[in-house]
A protein has these predicted regions:
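Conserved catalytic-core segments of large NTP-driven translation/proteostasis enzymes
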Residues: 114, 132-268
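Switch/connector loops and helix/strand junctions flanking conserved nucleotide-binding motifs
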Residues: 28, 89-90, 116-121, 148-152, ...
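Conserved Switch II/interswitch segment of TRAFAC-class P-loop GTPases
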Residues: 59-63, 73-95, 104-122
Length: 404
């Protein structure tokens, strides 16, 4: 299975294209049908020559942007719709910035409504914009609901997304929960490629999930080797207090409200003024405090959140400045709930222009070190050999005091 999400400005034909390609409507809420507007996430799929393409249809309206980003969690790529009459619009740019900063690099662009006479899409502008980002792999296709060939489009999508380049830690971020008669509580989400369906923890509690049944599309599954849309029916005793924003993992993880993250661009250029929102998987929180860490090796930022958040190292994140609407992407380095450690960190930060992370934290995750050969692995954290020798020397010098 390959899992894709849609993207694009409101009323640029995302749901219409998904309806064409799958034969199914994704707008299921009464308000969505009345207004002709996608509000929440929709889900569907199609099959082509034994290949399943699952699609998460996201809202295009700016008011539902939090729902939009939730739909991007763990997907393999994007179907990006652009109205050939209106051209590149506000939410086109907003969605593109979010996708780019989340490092979702495979994008299938669809120029919609090409049967209308007054089309005005500037294809040269689009290609120039895309070619300026060397990481993006893209194609641009023209689409008309009246004249386009269904099987041809299905084949183009399957062929384009043949190679999986997604890099996500073993996870499933829940994007929907509901109760179904005769089954009980059901949760759904996009499982990353290596996610083990036989050992699932609810990260918020670090307890094994008691599962009744797991399905993808219409089939019961025991495990998966690809990114997959998964529906999990739960046993009765854990049916409450679980829903969108919860993280499922294959290991016990740490929760913290002090977050250190490696950014993809120079963090000092990011506008921190005003409110910032952190998107992580299908979860989002307003950031209480955001600081740029001056460090010679990494583009590092520190965030204080209002609430604890389960943390997976190398989890992709997106930060949005709600004043300037500027975006910054990155990956989680590590998290802590230790207020004293954070105080020590900022004390060191005030004393120097470029902080030495090793001296401040002693143990570091692998993604914050330059050369693992110079470090000792201790419980999946790294300590430099020089620092270890220094610690051993101090212990030996004070051995009598320690033993007294």
């Amino acid at each position: 299975m390959t899992v894709l999400a849609t993207a694009g400005h409101v009323d640029h034909g995302k749901s219409t294209f998904v309806n064409f390609i799958t034969g199914q409507e994704t707008d299921r809420l009464k308000e969505e049908k009345t207004r002709g507007l996608t509000i929440n996430l929709g889900y569907t799929y199609f099959e082509f020559k034994n290949k399943i393409i699952s699609i998460v249809d996201v809202p295009g309206h700016v008011d539902y942007f939090k729902n939009t980003v939730a739909g991007f969690a763990n997907v393999d790529g994007i179907i990006f719709c652009i109205d050939s009459v209106q051209g590149w619009s506000n939410q086109s740019e907003e969605h593109f910035q979010a996708i780019s900063n989340l490092k979702i690099t495979n994008i299938f662009f669809v120029l919609t409504k090409t049967d209308l006479l007054d089309t005005s899409i500037d294809r040269g502008f689009l290609e120039k914009k895309l070619n300026s980002n060397k990481l993006i792999n893209y194609t641009i296709e023209e689409f008309s609901y009246k004249t386009s060939d269904l099987r041809m489009f299905q084949k183009k999508i399957v062929d384009f997304f043949k190679s999986d380049t997604s890099e996500n830690p073993n996870s499933l971020w829940i994007d929907r929960s509901f109760t179904k008669d005769g089954i009980g509580k059901v949760i759904t989400g996009t499982a990353s490629m290596a996610f083990d369906l036989n050992k699932i923890y609810l990260a918020r509690t670090n307890k094994l999930l008691e599962v009744k049944e797991i399905r993808n599309t219409e089939n019961i599954v025991k495990n998966t080797t690809t990114t997959s849309r998964i529906a999990i029916s739960l046993k009765k005793n854990i049916q409450d207090e679980i829903g969108r924003g919860d993280l499922l993992t294959n290991e016990i993880v740490f929760s913290g409200k002090y977050i250190f993250a490696i950014t993809d661009k120079q963090a000092s250029k990011f506008n921190k003024k005003g409110s910032n929102r952190l998107f992580i998987g299908t979860k989002n929180q307003i950031v209480k405090k955001l600081e740029v860490v001056n460090n010679s090796e990494k583009n590092l930022i520190f965030m204080e959140l209002p609430n604890n958040l389960p943390i997976l190292e190398n989890q992709k994140i997106l930060i949005q400045n709600l004043v300037s609407n500027e975006f910054m992407g990155g990956k989680i380095a590590f998290a802590s709930n230790n207020n004293n450690l954070v105080k020590k960190f900022f004390k060191e930060l005030r004393k120097t222009e470029s902080i030495n992370l090793e001296k401040t934290f002693t143990l570091l995750p692998e993604n914050l070190i330059e050369n693992s050969r110079d470090y000792i692995n201790i419980a999946n954290k790294y300590l430099s050999k020089d620092r270890l020798e220094s610690i051993i020397k101090k212990i030996n010098e004070n051995i009598e005091t320690i033993n007294s």
